[in-house]
Regions:
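Charge-rich, low-complexity segments
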Residues: 1-92, 101-107, 123
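Helical (often loop-to-helix) elements that flank the catalytic cores of nucleotide-handling enzymes
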Residues: 104-119
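Conserved short beta-strand edge segments in small beta-sheet-based binding/regulatory domains
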Residues: 115-130
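Beta-strand-rich binding-surface signature
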Residues: 95
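Short beta-strand->loop micro-motif that forms the acidic, two-metal-ion catalytic signature
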Residues: 98
């Protein structure tokens, strides 16, 4: 099973004072035992040339999808105990939201992925809870 569920995704958008937010989320996340994945890690990618609404232009959108696919592939390859449950785009940033069982196995593949994409500014924000 992949760390990124293939089915049951929906998206919506909303506006804030800082511009629009586009959200994609796994609709079955409410069926997951939260005790198995008690930590949240947000992988942040700064867009190089965001459009006027803070989202990617078409060429960069494909690059972001490819980056996401590569990260998921690395996490799958390492059998990392995590699930990707959300994706947000806002203000020139793409966030990939993971629920994580343990940061120890999560950090090495993410670090490798960050090294592979050194031409992009990336960061990881870790915190407890959902």
């Amino acid at each position: 099973m992949s760390v990124c569920p293939e089915n049951d995704w929906e998206s919506y958008s909303y506006s804030t004072d800082n511009g629009p937010v586009i959200v994609g989320f796994h609709t079955k996340s409410n069926t997951i035992n939260q005790n198995e994945y008690p930590y949240c890690a947000r992988v942040l990618i700064t867009l190089k040339k965001p459009n006027v609404h803070g989202g990617p232009l078409q060429d960069e959108a494909q690059v972001l999808w490819d980056m996401e696919d590569r990260l998921v592939a690395l996490l799958d390859e390492h059998k990392t105990p995590c699930l990707m449950l959300g994706r947000l785009t806002h203000g020139g940033t793409r966030e990939l939201v993971f629920q994580v069982a343990d940061y120890g196995p999560f950090r090495p593949p993410v670090g490798r992925w960050m090294g592979e994409h050194g031409d992009y500014e990336t960061d990881v924000s870790e915190h407890d809870g959902w």
